[in-house]
A protein has these predicted regions:
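Acidic/His-rich structured neighborhood in mature extracellular/periplasmic domains
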Residues: 71-196, 210-212, 220, 238-240, ...
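Structural motif
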Residues: 213-214, 232
Length: 281
C-alpha cells in the first residue's frame, strides 16, 4: 500500500511539474519585451534565451512565432539593402506573411542578430551557379510555391498528409502571365505542377495529422493566370491555431485556423499546401 501511495504521489508531482512548465513558458514569453521594439543588441540578448529554454527546434520556433503576435503589419518590407530594393535583409519591427515565416525561422536557427541575418540570406535567396547565395532582387525566392518545393529549409509535405489522388493540382509557368509576359522582371520562369489540398479535404482530421508547427500556403486560383499560385502563407501550431501576419488586422495574430479558413461568407482560398520548417539543411 505504501508503495502504491508513493507511486501515485510521484505521478501527481510529475503531472503538476509538467503543467507548471507549460504555464511557466507562457508566462516567460509575456515577460519579454515586444520583439518589434527591440534593437539589434537587445535581440542579441534575447535569442540565446530561446535557445536555452527551448532546446527542441520545433518547440523553439513555435514559441518565437507566439512571441511575435502583435507585430505591426507592413507589406513588402524586406529587401537587399541595395537598388532596386533598399529595405533591410532582415527586420523584426514590422512583418508581412512571408516575412513572418522566414524571419521567425531565421531567429529559431540563431543565437544573435548576425546569425539571424546570415540565416535569412540562406532562407530567402537562391544559390548562383557556384552555389553561393548572394542577396539580389533576381535571386530572391519571390514565389512561395517555388520556395516550398525547392528550398530545403521549407519542405512541402502535402502529399504525405493526403493521398495524391485526393489532391487538386495546377500546371503552371510561374512568373508568366497569360500573354506570355513576365509578372516580375526576373528573367526567370519555372513550369511546374503544384499539388494542393482542396477545401473539402481541410477538416479536423487533417489538422490532427499535423506536427506541432508547420507552414501553410494558401492557394488563390484567380492568380493562376498571372503565373502565381499562392495568395498568402502562415503557420499552424498544435494542429489548431493559425499564426500569420494579417493585412486586415494590421498585425500578426493567432486565431483558430478552421474558423479563419471557412468564414460564414465562404472560403477565400481554393486550397492549401503544408510545409515543414527545417533546422538543418
Amino acid at each position: 500500500m505504501r508503495l502504491i501511495k508513493s507511486l501515485l504521489m510521484i505521478s501527481m508531482m510529475s503531472s503538476l511539474m509538467s503543467c507548471q512548465e507549460t504555464i511557466t513558458n507562457d508566462k516567460w514569453l509575456a515577460t519579454l519585451p515586444s520583439p518589434w521594439t527591440l534593437t539589434q543588441e537587445q535581440m542579441d540578448e534575447t535569442l540565446p534565451q530561446f535557445q536555452q529554454r527551448f532546446p527542441d527546434f520545433q518547440d523553439r520556433l513555435k514559441h518565437i512565432a507566439l512571441w511575435r503576435v502583435g507585430t505591426p503589419y507592413e507589406i513588402f518590407k524586406l529587401g537587399e539593402e541595395v537598388e532596386p530594393d533598399l529595405d533591410p535583409i532582415i527586420r523584426y519591427d514590422v512583418s508581412d506573411c512571408t516575412g513572418h515565416n522566414l524571419t521567425s525561422l531565421a531567429a529559431a536557427k540563431s543565437s544573435n542578430w548576425d546569425d539571424a541575418r546570415n540565416n535569412m540570406i540562406k532562407l530567402h535567396y537562391k544559390p548562383d551557379s557556384n552555389g553561393v547565395k548572394q542577396p539580389s532582387y533576381k535571386s530572391r525566392w519571390h514565389y512561395t510555391v517555388d520556395r516550398i518545393t525547392m528550398n530545403p529549409n521549407t519542405v512541402d509535405i502535402t502529399q504525405s498528409l493526403v493521398p495524391k489522388a485526393a489532391l487538386d493540382s495546377v500546371n503552371i509557368t510561374l512568373n508568366q502571365k497569360e500573354d506570355g509576359a513576365e509578372f516580375l522582371e526576373l528573367d526567370w520562369k519555372r513550369t511546374m505542377t503544384a499539388y494542393y489540398i482542396p477545401n473539402h479535404e481541410i477538416t479536423p482530421a487533417l489538422m490532427a495529422k499535423l506536427p506541432k508547427i508547420v507552414g501553410v500556403a494558401f492557394v488563390k486560383p484567380r492568380y493562376f493566370k498571372m503565373g502565381i499560385v499562392m495568395g498568402h502563407e502562415g503557420m499552424i501550431i498544435d494542429g489548431k491555431y493559425l499564426i500569420h501576419a494579417s493585412q486586415s488586422a494590421g498585425e500578426t495574430v493567432k486565431l483558430d485556423f478552421l474558423k479563419y479558413y471557412f468564414p460564414e461568407e465562404g472560403a477565400f482560398f481554393g486550397g492549401i499546401m503544408i510545409f515543414e520548417f527545417k533546422e538543418n539543411s
